[in-house]
């Protein structure tokens, strides 16, 4: 039952995270408004929660060996590709995370959406978000290949 629960939570987090990062990017491409800012903040929060759940369940599944022994993953090039995509996603998230925290503080202090949401950085964060979504899809492709036995010698 643990194996099923972890796998389900892992995939739910993946789906929520993918939808949230796309929604964040879409909201940040809109003209500055209270609604766009609220949607961007909400999507960003879901993206963060989903990422913690996704990474947490993934590590648990890996280290506990609930699917395959950890050694299977360590020698599989598709696992290495997956981890590479994850590291890129995390690296791309640093600047947007810091910027969105700053914007949240400014909004909480009563700043007008036009003053809080700087259009240039918002467009860049939107682009980063869409690149991150693509990297998530590439992670899924690598995971499917790995789960089907590709990357290991028979």
Segments predicted by a language model, with ranges:
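Polytopic transmembrane helical bundles with strong interfacial aromatic enrichment
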Residues: 1-154
């Amino acid at each position: 039952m643990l194996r099923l629960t972890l796998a389900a939570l892992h995939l739910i987090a993946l789906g929520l995270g993918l939808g949230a990062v796309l929604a964040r990017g879409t909201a940040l491409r809109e003209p500055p408004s209270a609604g766009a800012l609220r949607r961007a903040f909400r999507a960003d929060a879901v993206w963060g929660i989903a990422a913690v759940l996704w990474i947490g369940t993934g590590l648990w599944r890996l280290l506990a060996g609930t699917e395959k022994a950890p050694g299977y993953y360590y020698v599989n090039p598709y696992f290495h590709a997956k981890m590479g995509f994850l590291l890129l996603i995390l690296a791309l998230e640093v600047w947007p995370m810091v910027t969105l925290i700053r914007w949240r503080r400014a909004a909480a202090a009563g700043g007008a959406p036009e003053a809080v949401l700087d259009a240039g950085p918002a467009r860049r964060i939107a682009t980063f978000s869409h690149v991150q979504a693509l990297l998530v899809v590439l992670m899924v492709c690598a995971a499917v290949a790995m789960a089907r036995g590709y990357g290991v010698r028979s």
